[in-house]
Amino acid sequence: MYQKMNKEKKLSANTPSGFVDRYGKELALKENLIAKIEENFLKFGFSKLETPSFEISENIGKFLPDEDRPSSGVFGFQEENNSWISLRYDLTAPLARYVSQNYLNISNPFKRYQIGNVWRNEKPGPGRFREFTQADCDIVGSSNPLADAEMCNLLADTLNFCGLEKNQYQIKLSNRKLIQGLIENLKILESKQQLTVLRAYR
Protein backbone atom coordinates (compact mmCIF):
# COMPACT_ATOMS: atom_id res chain seq x y z
CA MET A 1 0.00 0.00 0.00
CA TYR A 2 2.79 2.43 0.94
CA GLN A 3 4.78 1.62 -2.19
CA LYS A 4 1.71 2.28 -4.32
CA MET A 5 1.13 5.68 -2.69
CA ASN A 6 4.82 6.51 -3.04
CA LYS A 7 4.72 5.87 -6.78
CA GLU A 8 1.62 8.00 -7.23
CA LYS A 9 2.99 11.02 -5.37
CA LYS A 10 6.63 11.48 -4.45
CA LEU A 11 7.55 13.71 -1.54
CA SER A 12 9.54 16.84 -2.32
CA ALA A 13 13.04 16.50 -0.86
CA ASN A 14 13.31 20.21 -0.12
CA THR A 15 12.64 22.46 2.86
CA PRO A 16 10.20 25.35 2.39
CA SER A 17 11.86 28.57 1.25
CA GLY A 18 13.40 30.41 4.20
CA PHE A 19 13.69 27.33 6.44
CA VAL A 20 16.82 25.22 7.05
CA ASP A 21 17.92 21.95 8.63
CA ARG A 22 20.85 21.89 11.04
CA TYR A 23 22.89 18.83 11.91
CA GLY A 24 26.23 17.72 13.28
CA LYS A 25 28.93 20.35 13.83
CA GLU A 26 26.71 23.26 12.77
CA LEU A 27 24.03 22.31 15.29
CA ALA A 28 26.61 21.66 18.01
CA LEU A 29 28.11 25.11 17.39
CA LYS A 30 24.68 26.73 17.67
CA GLU A 31 23.84 24.88 20.89
CA ASN A 32 27.22 25.78 22.40
CA LEU A 33 26.68 29.45 21.53
CA ILE A 34 23.20 29.42 23.10
CA ALA A 35 24.61 27.78 26.23
CA LYS A 36 27.22 30.54 26.59
CA ILE A 37 24.63 33.27 26.08
CA GLU A 38 22.34 31.69 28.66
CA GLU A 39 25.19 31.28 31.15
CA ASN A 40 26.02 34.97 30.91
CA PHE A 41 22.38 36.07 31.21
CA LEU A 42 22.11 34.06 34.43
CA LYS A 43 25.37 35.57 35.71
CA PHE A 44 23.79 39.02 35.41
CA GLY A 45 20.80 37.93 37.50
CA PHE A 46 18.19 37.39 34.79
CA SER A 47 15.60 34.63 35.09
CA LYS A 48 14.51 32.40 32.22
CA LEU A 49 11.01 32.72 30.77
CA GLU A 50 9.34 30.28 28.39
CA THR A 51 6.20 31.24 26.46
CA PRO A 52 4.09 29.42 23.83
CA SER A 53 5.08 29.51 20.18
CA PHE A 54 1.59 30.81 19.42
CA GLU A 55 0.00 34.01 20.68
CA ILE A 56 -3.40 35.56 20.08
CA SER A 57 -2.90 37.51 16.86
CA GLU A 58 -4.00 40.82 18.39
CA ASN A 59 -1.27 40.44 21.02
CA ILE A 60 1.45 40.15 18.40
CA GLY A 61 1.12 43.89 17.85
CA LYS A 62 0.19 43.74 14.19
CA PHE A 63 -2.73 45.38 12.45
CA LEU A 64 -5.18 43.13 10.63
CA PRO A 65 -5.81 44.39 7.08
CA ASP A 66 -9.35 43.04 7.13
CA GLU A 67 -11.59 40.70 9.10
CA ASP A 68 -10.88 37.66 6.94
CA ARG A 69 -7.07 37.53 6.96
CA PRO A 70 -4.27 37.72 9.53
CA SER A 71 -1.78 40.53 9.09
CA SER A 72 1.15 40.28 6.74
CA GLY A 73 4.48 39.44 8.29
CA VAL A 74 3.19 36.71 10.60
CA PHE A 75 2.04 33.13 10.15
CA GLY A 76 -1.58 33.29 11.30
CA PHE A 77 -4.20 30.57 11.66
CA GLN A 78 -7.94 30.90 12.11
CA GLU A 79 -9.49 28.72 14.81
CA GLU A 80 -12.94 27.14 14.77
CA ASN A 81 -14.39 30.05 16.76
CA ASN A 82 -13.11 32.43 14.01
CA SER A 83 -10.43 33.93 16.27
CA TRP A 84 -6.85 34.19 15.00
CA ILE A 85 -3.64 32.87 16.55
CA SER A 86 -0.16 33.53 15.16
CA LEU A 87 3.32 32.12 15.52
CA ARG A 88 5.33 34.65 17.51
CA TYR A 89 7.08 37.24 15.35
CA ASP A 90 9.61 38.05 18.07
CA LEU A 91 9.98 37.52 21.82
CA THR A 92 8.96 41.03 22.87
CA ALA A 93 5.21 40.66 22.30
CA PRO A 94 5.03 37.46 24.42
CA LEU A 95 6.92 39.30 27.18
CA ALA A 96 4.43 42.18 27.12
CA ARG A 97 1.54 39.74 27.28
CA TYR A 98 3.15 37.78 30.14
CA VAL A 99 3.85 40.90 32.21
CA SER A 100 0.30 42.15 31.69
CA GLN A 101 -1.11 38.76 32.67
CA ASN A 102 1.10 38.29 35.75
CA TYR A 103 1.98 41.82 36.91
CA LEU A 104 0.70 41.17 40.45
CA ASN A 105 3.00 38.18 40.90
CA ILE A 106 6.29 39.26 39.33
CA SER A 107 9.17 41.22 40.85
CA ASN A 108 9.72 44.88 40.07
CA PRO A 109 11.95 45.44 38.23
CA PHE A 110 11.38 42.21 36.31
CA LYS A 111 14.59 40.85 34.80
CA ARG A 112 13.97 38.07 32.34
CA TYR A 113 15.61 36.44 29.34
CA GLN A 114 14.22 34.12 26.70
CA ILE A 115 15.88 32.19 23.90
CA GLY A 116 13.67 30.55 21.30
CA ASN A 117 12.59 30.32 17.69
CA VAL A 118 10.51 33.03 16.02
CA TRP A 119 8.76 33.05 12.65
CA ARG A 120 8.32 35.79 10.04
CA ASN A 121 6.14 35.47 6.98
CA GLU A 122 8.42 37.61 4.84
CA LYS A 123 10.41 37.16 1.65
CA PRO A 124 13.57 35.20 2.50
CA GLY A 125 17.00 36.09 1.17
CA PRO A 126 20.73 35.64 1.89
CA GLY A 127 21.05 35.47 5.68
CA ARG A 128 17.34 36.21 6.02
CA PHE A 129 15.25 33.28 7.21
CA ARG A 130 11.58 32.84 7.98
CA GLU A 131 12.42 30.84 11.12
CA PHE A 132 15.38 31.67 13.33
CA THR A 133 16.47 31.66 16.97
CA GLN A 134 16.32 34.90 18.92
CA ALA A 135 17.97 35.70 22.26
CA ASP A 136 16.06 38.38 24.15
CA CYS A 137 16.83 40.02 27.49
CA ASP A 138 14.85 42.80 29.18
CA ILE A 139 14.44 44.77 32.38
CA VAL A 140 10.78 45.71 32.87
CA GLY A 141 9.50 48.23 35.39
CA SER A 142 12.52 50.50 35.84
CA SER A 143 12.91 54.02 34.47
CA ASN A 144 16.40 54.33 35.97
CA PRO A 145 19.07 54.98 33.29
CA LEU A 146 21.24 52.47 35.14
CA ALA A 147 18.97 49.75 33.75
CA ASP A 148 19.86 50.83 30.21
CA ALA A 149 23.54 50.91 31.17
CA GLU A 150 23.24 47.40 32.60
CA MET A 151 21.75 46.15 29.32
CA CYS A 152 24.65 47.64 27.33
CA ASN A 153 27.14 46.08 29.74
CA LEU A 154 25.33 42.73 29.51
CA LEU A 155 25.38 42.79 25.71
CA ALA A 156 29.08 43.65 25.48
CA ASP A 157 30.03 41.09 28.13
CA THR A 158 27.98 38.38 26.39
CA LEU A 159 29.55 39.05 22.99
CA ASN A 160 33.02 38.97 24.57
CA PHE A 161 32.15 35.76 26.42
CA CYS A 162 31.10 34.19 23.11
CA GLY A 163 34.52 34.92 21.63
CA LEU A 164 34.17 38.26 19.86
CA GLU A 165 36.77 40.98 20.29
CA LYS A 166 35.69 44.53 21.15
CA ASN A 167 36.63 45.77 17.68
CA GLN A 168 34.38 43.17 16.03
CA TYR A 169 31.02 44.61 17.05
CA GLN A 170 29.14 47.86 17.65
CA ILE A 171 26.34 48.56 20.12
CA LYS A 172 23.77 50.97 18.72
CA LEU A 173 21.24 52.71 20.95
CA SER A 174 17.74 53.79 20.02
CA ASN A 175 14.88 55.56 21.77
CA ARG A 176 11.30 54.92 20.71
CA LYS A 177 10.30 58.43 21.83
CA LEU A 178 12.65 59.91 19.23
CA ILE A 179 11.22 57.64 16.53
CA GLN A 180 7.68 58.49 17.59
CA GLY A 181 8.58 62.17 17.34
CA LEU A 182 9.86 61.57 13.81
CA ILE A 183 6.58 59.87 12.87
CA GLU A 184 4.57 62.79 14.27
CA ASN A 185 6.81 65.35 12.54
CA LEU A 186 6.39 63.57 9.20
CA LYS A 187 2.64 63.33 9.88
CA ILE A 188 2.50 59.61 9.18
CA LEU A 189 -0.99 58.60 10.27
CA GLU A 190 -1.49 55.23 8.56
CA SER A 191 -0.66 52.33 10.90
CA LYS A 192 1.22 50.22 8.35
CA GLN A 193 3.45 53.14 7.37
CA GLN A 194 4.23 53.81 11.04
CA LEU A 195 5.21 50.15 11.46
CA THR A 196 7.51 50.40 8.43
CA VAL A 197 9.29 53.39 9.99
CA LEU A 198 9.67 51.57 13.32
CA ARG A 199 11.19 48.53 11.61
CA ALA A 200 13.61 50.69 9.63
CA TYR A 201 15.06 52.13 12.85
CA ARG A 202 15.37 48.85 14.75
Q: Could you describe each region identified by the protein language model?
A:
Residues Y2-R202:
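Extended, charged alpha-beta segments that form solvent-exposed binding/catalytic grooves
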